[in-house]
Structures are given as structure tokens and as C-alpha cells.
Regions:
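Short, hydrophobic beta-strand segments that form beta-sheet elements in well-ordered domains
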Residues: 65-67, 250-251, 273-274
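Second-shell loop/turn segments in exported
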Residues: 27, 46, 130-134, 204
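Polyanionic/metal-chelating signatures
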Residues: 140-143, 148-271
Length: 274
């Protein structure tokens, strides 16, 4: 497996709104399934593909077609964008947008803490795969405006704490609407790092080599657990195994650590996004 580093992706913001099932007591509600066509625009499909005087066809917030010769359906809302440019938005694939980092756990105990504080979870509290970004998420309009002004339309946000940090969520930076309308994917990837969690004072690991050893041990334990060889329930390992089908995103922190992370991926046949 070759070392692969992540580049920021470009894509159109596809905001799909699900069927409205909540009562609306403030106004008369009507479902609009009409098409919207943005015409005569200069559409940047990619860095080397540009459509002059192009048309972008949208239905229910989703881009259906783009091109020069697009058949515009009847009853379509047409917006003339002559002289305007349409660009895909950036996606911040490694973000903590709207997810406040937890407070550092204080302790008056001067002796080292070797045991975990949590029961029913992994033996090391720096492993926290059960965390999900949505459980800590609060939309930040001010920060969203800043990101939108820089060309970002979507963020892949997560709780930036721990060696295994849990699952992130893909969020559209829409200033209007609610979080239920902004959520593109509730679980968009599993996040990892070599950094200790500030939510615990557990002594181990104390070094980068210790973090690597702990991560390797977790993979062995997770496989052993998956085979049914551990009778006790471990909520952290169960979450880790559940998240194993997600994209695995690891924060290495340096070029040397990126190589180290890739070697761990080689060992367990995992392609990290680094």
C-alpha cells in the first residue's frame, strides 16, 4: 500500500431536503418540486473544464445537469446569470467546526492514574470511538460566514480529542434552515491521531511510540472481540468495529508520523487518509 496524503476535494454542494413530516403552524405549506435553471453562466466544472454560457439545472436542491445545451423543463424557474461565474465549493475534510473541544480533566491526585475512569469501555480512556460529532455539535453562524467567504461550502467535522476520536459528520454551511437540513452524513468517517485525550488523566501512553503501540493493540483486540473471543461487553471496541467501514482519517502531525501511521495501516490492511 502506498502512502496517500489528502488533497482538499472540490464538489458542488448538493443539499437534499427530505420530506417534511413536522407540522407547520405558522404558514401555509406547499411542496415545490419545480426545476430551477441558472442560465448563461460561466460554469467551472473542474480546474481544466469550463462551460461558457452554460446552464445548471437544479431540482429539490440537487444539481441534476450542467452543460451548454440543456433542455429546460416546463414550469421551470429561470435565473439569468449572464456575466456571473459558478464555482464548486471547497470541502474541509478535517474540521472541528461547531464542535467545542472538551475541558481538560483536572485532578488533585499527584500519583499517576493507571486505571480507566469509565466502566464498560476499553481499558484505556484515550480510546474513544463511541464519540460522535453530532452529539457535541452546535452550528456557528459567524464561523460559517467566514468559511463561506473563503469558498468552503461543506465541512467534515469531528471532536478533536483522543487517539481514537470517534465518528465525524458531514455538514453543509447553510446559514438558513436547521441542523436536520444541514446534515449530509451523520457518520462520515472515523478519526484517529497519536495525541492523548484531555478528558482523562490516565498515564499511558506517554510518548508517540506508546500511542502507536496502543493503537496496534486496539486493532488486535478489536479483531479478537469480533471473533467472539471476549465475553465481556466493550462499548468502545463495538463502536470501533462499527466505524471500521467508514473512511479512516488520521491526524499524524508531522511527516515522520505520517510514515509511521502508514506503516500501521499496512500492518492491518487499512488505507488511512492522512
Amino acid at each position: 500500500m502506498k502512502l496517500k496524503l489528502t488533497l482538499l476535494s472540490l464538489c458542488y454542494i448538493l443539499l437534499s431536503y427530505s420530506q417534511d413530516y413536522k407540522p407547520n403552524n405558522t404558514s401555509v405549506k406547499s411542496n415545490n418540486t419545480n426545476f430551477t435553471a441558472i442560465t448563461n453562466a460561466k460554469i467551472h466544472i473542474s480546474d481544466d473544464k469550463i462551460i461558457e454560457n452554460g446552464t445548471l439545472l437544479i431540482q429539490d436542491g440537487v444539481v441534476i445537469k450542467s452543460g451548454k445545451e440543456i433542455n429546460i423543463p416546463k414550469n421551470c424557474v429561470v435565473i439569468d446569470a449572464r456575466g456571473k461565474f459558478l464555482y464548486p465549493s471547497f470541502i474541509d475534510v478535517f474540521s472541528s467546526f461547531g464542535v467545542k473541544k472538551p475541558n481538560r480533566l483536572s485532578s488533585s491526585n499527584r500519583s499517576p492514574q493507571y486505571e480507566p475512569l469509565r466502566e464498560g469501555y476499553y481499558w484505556n480512556d484515550h480510546i474513544r470511538p463511541e464519540q460522535n460529532a453530532l452529539n457535541y455539535f452546535e452550528f456557528d453562524k459567524k464561523k460559517a460566514r467566514e468559511l463561506l467567504s473563503l469558498g468552503f461550502g461543506v465541512v467534515n467535522t469531528h471532536l478533536n480529542d483522543g487517539i481514537v476520536r470517534g465518528s465525524g459528520s458531514l455538514i453543509a454551511l447553510s446559514l438558513k434552515g436547521t441542523n436536520s437540513e444541514r446534515i449530509i452524513s451523520k457518520k462520515s468517517g472515523q478519526y484517529l491521531s497519536f495525541e492523548r485525550s484531555i478528558q482523562t488523566n490516565q498515564a499511558y501512553p506517554t510518548s508517540i511510540m506508546g500511542s502507536m503501540a496502543l493503537l496496534r493493540q486496539l486493532y488486535h483486540d478489536a479483531l479478537w472481540y469480533k471473533k467472539g473471543n471476549i465475553k465481556n461487553t466493550d462499548l468502545a471496541i463495538e463502536a470501533f468495529n462499527t466505524n471500521s467501514n467508514l473512511t479512516q482519517i488520521i491526524s499524524a502531525g508531522s511527516r515522520e508520523n505520517a510514515i509511521r501511521a502508514d506503516k500501521i495501516g499496512d500492518q492491518f490492511n487499512i488505507q488511512y487518509v492522512i
